Amino acid sequence: MEWFNVGRIVNTHGIRGEVRILSTTDFEKERFAVGNKLAAFKKDDKKPTGVTIQSVRRHKNFILLTFEGMNNINLVEPFKEGLLKVTKDQMTDDLLEENEFFFHEIIGCTVVSEEGETIGVVNDILQTGANDVWVVKGSKKEHYIPYIEDIVKDIDVDEKKIVIHVMEGLL
């Protein structure tokens, strides 16, 4: 089964089973809503424990969660420094707006110019604030391609292919 990180359990909080989460998702409200089911992975463990969110609140830069049936610090302590993940099935497209994609859909795509020349493969995405920048590993060097309308002309996630307009100085 393919898993995707949505948060890291950095510590416990209090004695009533709250855990302190550092979010790694763009969809915090949806992922950490009361009643949602997540997979909790203990540190250095490959086997998940299914958890259901019982309560959620913000505290400083963290999200504090409690899980159903785990209302004691002793029950959540083993998950400290672990990860919270969702399955690919839980990554629904209704969270995305038009021309938005999940990172896992873009990473691994082959980038080609409008003329058909292969530029490389997307191996990372940098979030710069203004727009995302794709790190494309070419045969000789890495290229940084901004995800903007003037450059990215077509994205086919099924075929894992992206067509870009190569502006002067881009590569």
UniProtKB/Swiss-Prot annotation:
Residues 98-170 form the PRC barrel domain. Gene3D superfamilies: PRC-barrel domain, RimM. One of its GO terms (molecular function) is ribosome binding. SUPFAM superfamilies: PRC-barrel domain, Translation proteins. One of its GO terms (biological process) is ribosomal small subunit biogenesis. GO terms for cellular component: cytoplasm; ribosome. Keywords: Chaperone, Cytoplasm, Ribosome biogenesis, rRNA processing. It is found in: Cytoplasm. Coiled coil: none annotated. The keyword Phosphoprotein does not apply. Pfam families: PRC (PF05239), RimM (PF01782). An accessory protein needed during the final step in the assembly of 30S ribosomal subunit, possibly for assembly of the head region. Essential for efficient processing of 16S rRNA. May be needed both before and after RbfA during the maturation of 16S rRNA. It has affinity for free ribosomal 30S subunits but not for 70S ribosomes. Binds ribosomal protein uS19. HAMAP family: Ribosome_mat_RimM. Belongs to the RimM family. The PRC barrel domain binds ribosomal protein uS19. NCBIfam families: 16S_RimM. This is Ribosome maturation factor RimM. The gene is rimM.
